[in-house]
Swiss-Prot record:
Function (record text): DNA ligase that catalyzes the formation of phosphodiester linkages between 5'-phosphoryl and 3'-hydroxyl groups in double-stranded DNA using NAD as a coenzyme and as the energy source for the reaction. It is essential for DNA replication and repair of damaged DNA.
Name listed for the protein in its UniProt record: DNA ligase
EC number(s) recorded for this UniProt protein: 6.5.1.2
Native organism: Polaromonas naphthalenivorans (strain CJ2)
Alphabetical keyword list: DNA damage, DNA repair, DNA replication, Ligase, Magnesium, Manganese, Metal-binding, NAD, Zinc
Sequence positions that bind Zn(2+): 438, 441, 456, 462
Group of enzyme by EC: ligase
Family as reported in the entry's similarity comment: Belongs to the NAD-dependent DNA ligase family. LigA subfamily.
Length: 707
């Protein structure tokens, strides 16, 4: 061989014959069609043996021509390698929860219809509102992302903002198409529920029992289909996920290509669902249009009668305003749509015995009576505790130790005592009464006028409140102290190592490493996490204080309005009422919290320990440099992630859109910018880089770079 031959380019592999390419495409289309008929429509059109023959033919052709293998092939539903862990996915459009109507009777539907009509400003003489009535599946919410018709990502709901990438496992669900028809939009996120059929659940548990009988280690049976489905979705090996034989129903969309970029135009939610069906997604056959409260009630009652005969678990029905224009008009409140509600059914009930009545003390000092029960299986779980809510509720039901009671899972989640069987009561059973002292710290327990609950006055001196207050402060949505979990906090408090929040920052490596079951590496990591947590934000710190009625949204509103913690601490109730989302009850709670000297002392000690955040001017006088400007980000920026850039633009008053239009002010272009950059140039939209964006963020409003 000559020297020249050594450096010659390798001969490219010949292209497969056109007949092979055409046969592979035909087999994939035919197998997809038969899978849809079998798994979605329940109308198989060929024998299983014929399906298997076609499948094996496709496998053989792909093995002979691996260059033709694609991820959307029917042969690739179970083919991924086991994962080490799941990657996080930030939802482009949050997966929000739906409000639950607590009234399980007909009045629940009437209440929702009344709220909708009031929100829309309708009179009694106006026609009924058109709704879509759907099933509320008892499964796991899922978002399926398709790009150019191919399934590219599946993500769990997570906290609504960030979920987990479970694409490999979702590919194993036969009802979910891997490729969409040609008329599907370029980008689409389909939202729905992953669930397990009851017959598959029974078969799974039977297989588990067989494994256990053969001596398999670490195997167990599952309590209910939902837990089995959730566990299947979170299997690191897709082969194990496939064994769960999960199913899927679609009920909506997230991000979707807008009409101006070639996306579909929908006027109603029902039209959207019918289109999803045409794109091969399973939609529950029970879904109906309903006009006004009477038809909502009829649907709720009809499904209630069918509930036990359905092949899968549901825990209620869902009502949605059908018109998408009216949905947009009604909007959201506290991250829940005003135009939708979940209407549940009365929970399953069982008899059991009250063994004791204990008092639990929460992080805000609330004393809650809890009935300790003889274990009973209710609604798919074993129940040993049931809340009695408060003194009035406990006395109204007259629950006593030794009573035989009816217990149910209220909303299929929180167990509660429904009633007492008085004919089975033990003679001379003493009546329950709330203690006047906190059972944890002995401080007085008081019930304020107009309140239903007793609360411990021990504040941060109460061990129960200390534990919960520290856990709340360390939560990932508050100040975030990684590694500070329940057991460690309990150990630190119970041993007297920490008594108040500032004591956390006085912990040293030596004191931590000396704790039982605390390795040196863990102690070192916690010290680093504590140091890292000192750099926080004002909203996180305010939320972390655990002020009653102050959640994340309110903490953010307070920080935006006042700009500085001292201004929040010194604000009067009247000044607090000027803040969005703050009403009289919340204002009084905030004022009461900061009127307590020990609370102010804790705040000052935390500051002295080095906890700090960036403060700004009050919203009323703080200029926002990007106010009223719309941005689109494309490509990879050199220093900022897309989420970081979006957060900074929004914090400066700007808006970040997903597509370029004539209304776009700036397109921020990074490396490998694509079609958005081309469209911006065609429309004459200003194109800037990251450096220019940073300059815009730092410039006064009147010095912005002109578009």
């Amino acid at each position: 061989m000559s020297t020249l031959d050594l450096f010659a380019s390798p001969t490219p592999a010949p292209m497969p014959p056109a007949s092979v390419i055409e046969r592979i495409a035909a087999l994939r289309a035919e197998l997809d069609l038969h899978a849809h008929r079998y798994y979605v429509l329940d109308e198989p059109s060929i024998p299983d043996a014929e399906y298997d023959r076609l499948f094996k033919e496709l496998q053989a052709l792909e093995a002979a021509h691996p260059e033709l293998l694609t991820p959307d092939s029917p042969t690739q539903r179970v083919g991924g390698k086991p994962l080490g862990q799941f990657a996080s996915v930030r939802h482009r459009i949050p997966m929000l929860s739906i409000r639950t109507e607590t009234d399980t009777e007909a009045t629940g539907a009437r209440n929702f219809d009344t709220r909708v009509r009031k929100e829309l400003g309708l009179k009694e003489s106006d026609p009924p509102v058109e709704y879509v009535a759907e099933l509320k599946f008892d499964g796991l919410a899922m978002s399926l992302r398709y790009e150019n018709g191919v399934l590219v990502q599946a993500a769990t709901r997570g906290d609504g903002e960030v979920g987990e990438d479970v694409t490999q496992n979702i590919r194993t669900i036969r009802q979910i198409p891997l490729r969409l028809p040609a008329d599907a939009p370029p980008v689409m996120e389909v939202r729905g529920e992953v669930y397990m059929r009851r017959d598959e659940f029974e078969a799974l548990n039977e297989r588990q029992r067989e494994k256990i009988a053969k001596g398999a280690k670490g195997e167990k049976t599952f309590v209910n289909p939902r837990n089995a489905a959730a566990g299947g979705v979170r299997q690191l090996d897709p082969a194990f996920a496939a064994e769960r034989r999960l199913s899927f129903f679609a009920y909506g969309v997230g991000e979707i290509t807008p009409p101006e970029e070639g996306g579909p135009v929908f006027e109603t939610h029902f039209e959207l669902l019918q289109t999803l069906k045409s794109w091969c997604f399973p939609v529950a056959a029970q879904t109906r249009l309903a006009y006004g409260a009477p038809e909502l009630i009829a649907f709720h009652e009809a499904i209630g009668r069918q509930r036990d005969q359905l092949p899968y678990d549901i825990d209620g029905v869902v009502y949605k305003v059908n018109s998408l224009a009216l949905q947009r008009k009604m909007g959201f409140v506290s991250r829940e749509p005003r135009w939708a509600v979940a209407h549940k059914y009365p929970a399953q009930e069982q008899l059991t015995t009250v063994l004791a009545i204990d008092i639990q003390v929460g992080r805000t000092g609330k004393l809650t009576p809890v009935a300790k029960l003889a274990p009973v299986f209710v609604g798919g779980v074993t129940v040993t505790n049931a809340t009695l809510h408060n003194e009035d509720e406990a006395r109204r039901k007259d629950v006593r130790v030794g009573d035989t009671v009816i217990v149910r899972r209220a909303g299929d989640v929180i167990p509660e005592v429904v009633s007492v069987l008085l004919d089975k009561r033990v003679q001379d059973a003493p009546q329950f009464s709330m203690p006047r002292q906190c059972p944890v710290c002995g401080s007085d327990a008081v019930r304020e006028e107009g309140e239903a609950d007793y609360r411990c006055t021990g504040g941060l001196f109460c061990a129960a409140q200390r534990k919960e207050a520290i856990l709340h402060y360390a939560h990932k949505r508050a100040v975030e102290i990684e590694g500070l979990g329940d057991k460690l906090v309990e150990q630190l408090v119970d041993t007297g190592v920490i008594r108040t929040l500032p004591d956390l920052y006085r912990l040293g490596f030596t004191s931590l490493a000396s704790l039982d079951r605390m390795a040196e590496k863990s102690a070192s990591n916690l010290v680093a996490a504590l140091e890292k947590s000192k750099q926080t934000t004002l909203p996180r710190f305010v939320f972390g204080l655990g002020i009653r009625h102050v959640g994340e949204a309110t903490a953010k509103a307070l920080a935006r309005h006042f700009g500085q913690l001292d201004s929040i601490m010194d604000a009067s109730e009247e000044q607090l009422l000027e803040v969005a989302d703050v009403g009289p009850i919340v204002a009084k709670s905030i004022r009461t919290f900061f009127e307590q000297p020990h609370n102010r002392e804790v705040v000052e000690q935390l500051r002295a320990c080095g906890v700090t955040w960036e403060e700004g001017a009050p919203a009323a006088v703080a200029p926002k440099p990007l106010s009223g400007k719309t941005f689109v980000i494309t490509g990879t920026l050199p220093g900022l992630s897309r989420d970081d850039a979006k957060d900074r633009i929004e914090a400066a008053g700007g808006k970040v859109a997903g597509s370029v239009s004539k209304k776009t002010d700036y397109v921020v272009a990074g490396l490998d910018a694509g079609s958005k950059l081309v469209k911006a140039e065609a429309l004459g939209v200003a194109v800037i880089d990251e450096a220019t964006l940073l300059a815009l963020l730092d410039s006064p409003p009147d010095e912005r770079i002109p578009a």
